[in-house]
């Protein structure tokens, strides 16, 4: 397919067979890759970034529809249809052996690749107080908060960018639960090499439950992730 390359990695993942190599050009791939076929121990299926760390698979989308709300806080509205059957802004982090309060969502807001801190209310978002437990307290004043507009079926996100214009800066939100993971089990002998994998809205993964992650084998064997 060198003369007529696929537009999406997942297009290749649907048809790749044992022994195939999928070479991925540099760029940002905003998609979920769901490999369908397993390789074999003597004939792996390999997904390789042509340029090491040049191909980025991200679970986020850029948002440029922010409007000023109050002080340093902006607000945007996102149609829930964007998220499909998994909305990171209605899904909480919780589960077995998770002992913190279940008040944080799996989604997040990013300003120039820096994750903002989730607030418990719009007021908290506006106040932008330091979170003392943070390893970088000065960054913890960048806050976000979310709520649902049931009538319009929209996710509403407020964010405090401290004077930055979110429509000019690179501001992203999580959209996808995973970046590279088979939806079915037993898709073995896969190699994934040289990618940046980032910004998926994964759930909590206790040892006795579904092992979620930005990238993972989903109960398959013989994987190499490098």
Region annotations inferred by a language model:
Residues 1-226:
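Extracellular polysaccharide-degrading/modifying enzymes targeting complex plant/algal/animal polysaccharides
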